[in-house]
Amino acid sequence: MVDRSSSKSRYGVYGRARKELNNGYSVCIFPEKDYLDESVLLNPFKQGAFKLAIEHQLPILPMAFYDCKRKMPWYTYYGRPGSLRVESFEPIYTLGLEEKDIPVVQEIARQKIYNALTSDPKKATEKALKLWEGVMQRQNPSS
């Protein structure tokens, strides 16, 4: 886990991920910025995961986790056990890409995930966002 408020922690995690990749292992990185805000469907992405992929010329496999906001919300009183639906998409190949290409690759990955979340037939994320709005209204009734 990374302490996002600490540059030392962020750099340490980045270094460990680089080491694992150098040793031939795969890594799973959740690149979302400020993920603790339950009112946002999908935040913009940080660059680190994409920089690592391009640096090592490795493909990126975007994945949508449909039920996270409902099953594992950050306002822990309302979490519950259960299964998560996960969808993986076609890889984004980085062979021949350079650091200057990071913003484009970042946005392609984010859009694939965002489009999947907004077209979920079970509307799990939308339901979770509405639940969160209700929690906030009960907490701050004058808002």
Language-model regions: role of each:
Residues 11-143:
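Non-catalytic C-terminal accessory region of glycerolipid acyltransferases
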Residues 1-8:
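Catalytic core of membrane glycerolipid acyltransferases/transacylases, capturing the structured
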